[in-house]
Amino acid sequence: MTRPFNFSAGPANLPEEVLRQAAAEMLDWHGSGMSVMEMSHRGKEFISIYEHAEADFRELMEIPEHFKILFMQGGGLAENAIVPLNISRGGLADFVVTGSWSDKSQKEARKYCDVQIAATNESSAHTSLPPPATWQLRRDASYVHVCTNETIHGVEFQELPDLKALGSDAPLVIDFSSHVASRPVDWSKVGLAFGGAQKNLGPAGVTLVVVREDLLGHALAVCPSAFNYKTVADNDSMYNTPPTYAIYIAGLTFQWLKRQKEGEATGIAAMEKHNLAKAKLLYDAIDHSGLYINKVSKDCRSRMNVPFLLRDESRNEDFLAGAKARGLLQLKGHKSVGGMRASIYNAMPLAGVEALVSYLQEFEQKHA
């Protein structure tokens, strides 16, 4: 059976190899007689799965040893509270608001610390990014929060900001939920990174947190123990029962990522090349069209989430119906911005983008 191409923004498509391996191991993982879903999280079988997943993620992302990797629950939305509960010390936090997700983040953080919006792209309707040189950063801020890829508006920081160069000693907190593992990360610029797995790493249910060790141990007294980073780190993410099956699928995805090759590049470097090629193909098709529009500035277009509008919005339902008939699924844009959105995460093959581009051209010719 040929599977359709799923352009969902998340939960998103998973590598077919991963799904097939999980299916083969569903009833009996490696001769254990158990499904992973049935295992004790403290048994040797699951401990092996967890340790391999953590080691593979560290290797893939080239995460230095002075960072802890935590497998948590609650998704990126919960991290909007968990981060200030752990590292704000009840003080100041600066936020760069570039779309829906960073806006949600700053609103949530206000419950726990003094929030300042250091920069925003609201005047451009979230279609550009405020240059770092214009950010109004406070010298005594506990941290600076940036969403490095806005899933809804389709804007992405092509490089991480260098806070030290901007005169700030605050740790940079990045929400990389929707582009984690799509490109390398310069960890010298980062204090803490978090991301839900359900876009690029696995199913919903597990949240990856990468936190510098010096940021541990400063949680507010009201922080729930299950969300205290130091407690989670000290217990190897097993303080409470972790989302075992989601961690298992994420681990299979890490192994799949390690196998990726693009020329001489492997792993995340190969994935970045692959993602750049997919994004270029789709943006070129939109830009050379007379029917479709992408309003995001070219210097900050997301490689993962490509929103676009039809100039004649009365054709939207026809477009979506035709796409579904061709096996191109979940292209409807977010309700807050309308139009269409193609999410082309790591697991989306080039063939999927080629099929979408072919349909874009076919639909335009039909309705020219």
Swiss-Prot record:
One Gene Ontology cellular component: cytoplasm
Note on cofactor: Binds 1 pyridoxal phosphate per subunit.
UniProt keyword annotation of Amino-acid biosynthesis present: yes
UniProt subcellular location: Cytoplasm
Pfam family, one: Aminotran_5
Quaternary context: Homodimer.
Name of the protein described by the UniProt record: Phosphoserine aminotransferase
Origin species: Polaromonas naphthalenivorans (strain CJ2)
Name of the encoding gene: serC
